[in-house]
UniProtKB/Swiss-Prot annotation:
Superkingdom field: Bacteria
Entries under NCBIfam families matching the protein: mutS1, PRK05399.1
InterPro entries, per the entry: DNA_mismatch_repair_MutS, DNA_mismatch_repair_MutS-lik_N, DNA_mismatch_repair_MutS/MSH, DNA_mismatch_repair_MutS_C, DNA_mismatch_repair_MutS_clamp, DNA_mismatch_repair_MutS_core, DNA_mismatch_repair_MutS_N, DNA_mismatch_repair_MutS_sf
Keywords: ATP-binding, DNA damage, DNA repair, DNA-binding, Nucleotide-binding
GO MF, one example: ATP-dependent DNA damage sensor activity
Organism field: Cronobacter sakazakii (strain ATCC BAA-894) (Enterobacter sakazakii)
Protein's name according to its UniProt entry: DNA mismatch repair protein MutS
UniProt key word Nucleotide-binding: yes
Amino acid sequence: MSTSETFDAHTPMMQQYLKLKAQHPDILLFYRMGDFYELFYDDAKRASQLLDISLTKRGASAGEPIPMAGVPHHAVENYLAKLVNLGESVAICEQIGDPATSKGPVERKVVRIVTPGTISDEALLQERQDNLLAAIWQDSKGFGYATLDISSGRFRVSEPQDRETMAAELQRTNPAELLYAEDFAEMSLIEGRRGLRRRPLWEFELDTARQQLNLQFGTRDLVGFGVENAPRGLCAAGCLLQYVKDTQRTSLPHIRSITMERQQDGIIMDAATRRNLEITQNLAGGVENTLASVLDCTVTPMGSRMLKRWLHMPVRDTSVLRHRQQAIAALMEYSTEIQPVLRQVGDLERILARLALRTARPRDLARMRHAFQQLPTLNTLLADIEAEYVQTLREQMGDFAELRDLLERAIIEAPPVLVRDGGVIAPGYHEELDEWRALADGATDYLDRLEIREREKLGIDTLKVGFNAVHGYFIQVSRGQSHMVPIHYVRRQTLKNAERYIIPELKEYEDKVLTSKGKALALEKQLYDELFDLLLPHLAELQKSAAALAELDVLTNLAERADTLNYHCPTLTDKPGIRLVEGRHPVVERVLNEPFIANPLSLSPQRRMLIITGPNMGGKSTYMRQTALIVLMAYIGSFVPAEQAEIGPIDRIFTRVGAADDLASGRSTFMVEMTETANILHNATEHSLVLMDEIGRGTSTYDGLSLAWACAESLANRIKALTLFATHYFELTQLPEKMEGVANVHLDAIEHGDTIAFMHSVQDGAASKSYGLAVAALAGVPKEVIKRARQKLRELESLSGNAAATQVDGTQMSLLAAAEETSPAVEALENLDPDSLSPRQALEWIYRLKSLV
């Protein structure tokens, strides 16, 4: 921006603009001028590129032409949505003064700041997805993380202990905007994320955070919220709350509490596991063929968002899960009656947030009224359902008969979009408003009478009375009869074929009508604001009702899914292990054209690891993933795709399946694989479910097999986790003979000549062969290459006596034999105590070691 000249050299309007822009230097400023929001200087250039709008110039100020771009005020929401999706923030500056009475530029001020994480307008939000603002803090003891959904008031804090846990939280919550301290050390953790906002250190100060939070909640301390002993989480929460207050510039009555999220309350899944299981997002970044796409047939947006939160944070409290299971079982026969009524409730949660922020529009209040009108029907439908938890939700839903009556009296049936358009308050609600409206609406009768009278009196048959927004009321006469008008007709406008006039009587009436319209509109705005004052005292009960309705939607949806997709209620037991009868993959079975082959699974302390072999495309990965998804579904309270399921305590789910280069971080496929494996070996427990697919394949055969063997050994013997271990290293099928708790299973296939038929059936024991060449032929590898490969395979098998492919000697694998022979030099070093040697003895040892190598 060209500001080298003195401030006084600018025009008064540009001085006003520059003052406001100086308060918001890092974000775009939408500056209201009449029917447009204008942007100037660098903002104009940036907006022109981002929004693909014209960049023009507006005169000059301080001797320089001013770059300018603008958007019409009636279409501003579309442009804001585009900017927010690009991660931009925008300050909205409105005219608050009256142009008619202003001397100099009309008074303006920034009334709100729209940022990706603080939007509540439905036009800017994705209705079936949470939109979170987050803040992250780090000190020597770990991380603090806070999230807020301003469109619901849901405020959460956590204290991830390490980088992996923090990465998993970022993946789970996927914030639209992330605040971080200016000295944040782990930038690689957040780089490349959308909506990053660097904040000064003082905003993360602990005492300030406590003060801010107590002020918001009207409390003396935070003990009642269970966050008092979470200093890192509070630092993040304090910064977040300050940012929301700065951007919203209004009170936030819907943010009434803060909740501590503890890892031990839910099943922990790291970022790789969430990605690999394709819970709400597939590996390509879309939403098709995910677990959510199968399970989410909710009928309200708030129900859909709640279901996705459940899927990303399964709970371990079995009493909560049993309540959900009982509710789902009870709702199964009622789902077809309940869902159509729930559909009419809409997104009450977000409407209440806009009510709290005083940004709710007339149609929001009409939708709220419509939601209230569904409650009596829902109450009647739920009254006969015996499940205790359904009755709890029914009580929390409430009735709100008084508020329903208020909105039925106050708001017309189909209100306009904006209150400033008028016609929002229903006739009969307020006597004075009806009087002003009658005066304004009576204009039509008066004008008809005036037109007939003047036409007959003057004998001008082309005379008619009309109105337009620019010139107001007028009497129009054709050009051919204009000579017949009397002297008191004052010409107001000349058209091609007509003249328009005003007379004192019509001018007087015009003033009266315009005054009445203005007064009616002003009174209507006042009454609309008073409605907020009447509704807001009930906000807490209304939010509780919205949460109950959302949960009822989720449970009814899960009941419908269970009934439609033949899911059964799992048994959650204290006995460790997982036992599935006829288990199915919930997503794959929906996309297959042929019947899905269901398979059993049995894991227990006595059979805690399955070594899974079989051909590529045989179904190993599907079998493993379906187990994890069934466990995940069971731990949100859902029924599962299995004839029977008995599932013991699970604290974490880990997956090490597939990998791609992480080129941005300079990590190869093998490095990514080993990083994920290290995370599992460090963090898995005996109650964890671990899926390991093709471990060690990214390096040489010797290295890969060694690593796979050692990892399997560690998981089975040291950690004792419930493990599904898929491999092409047939040497690993000897593990059951060497350690307890390990068993072989394989996916069946039948080879006939050059073709292969995958049976997708899980059988006990190891696979007899790999079928790799048959799969390669199926994939279209040229026949001459397959032929040469068969020839080479026979050569290799004869060279090694088939040892590399199938055999293991009495005590150890042939492939690992060389690796496991300890060097004499290493043995000598292991037995050596360097602290006991004199310099002379040390020198002698060097010569001795040299001779051993």
